[in-house]
Amino acid sequence: TEVLVQTVVHELDSGADCRVLDLCAGSGCIGLAAAANLPNARVLLGELDDEALKICRQNIRRNDLTGRVVSLQLDAREKPPTHLGEFDCIVSNPPYIPDGDIAGLDVSVRDYEPHLALKGGADGLDFYRDITRLWTAALRVGGRLLFEVGIGQADEVLRIMRSVGFGDLEITPDLNGIPR
């Protein structure tokens, strides 16, 4: 996730006004870190889960970013509301664990993380398909769609993105050298 934040900051001009959407925001850490490093960015934390949204709002206040960061209940698997407008960057670390793998997760994850934040469909790629297909319409011309992907999913996510017309794609390894 650190590398994803670095990529967002690198892709956007730190001095320019820009709009960033952190979709499937969870606690909001990606969007909040982007806002902290991009002083002219306006960031929307989009999250479906009510409890996660409460945490997003607390984190916005704790980080003193209430003037530039807002949170909103959004479903990444549905078409974006038109009133949101367009974004320079949509970033997402969506649920990517195949549904059948949930039972085998470490207890510290399986029993304490909301399954809504983990379950990515039969192959773990449902959110990538939906976000790429539906949310591209909310990107400005030349905008960036950035994902964190599960281990072993990078090539398939690239294929999904190419299938809707994305070019100039790259995979960045995480701090352990794993394509994410």
Can you say where each PLM-predicted feature lies in the sequence?
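Conserved SAM/SAH cofactor-binding pocket of Class I
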Residues: E2-G104
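Structural signal for short hydrophobic segments within the conserved structured cores
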Residues: V70-L72, L116, E170
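Mobile active-site "lid"/loop adjacent to the S-adenosyl-L-methionine
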Residues: Y96-D126
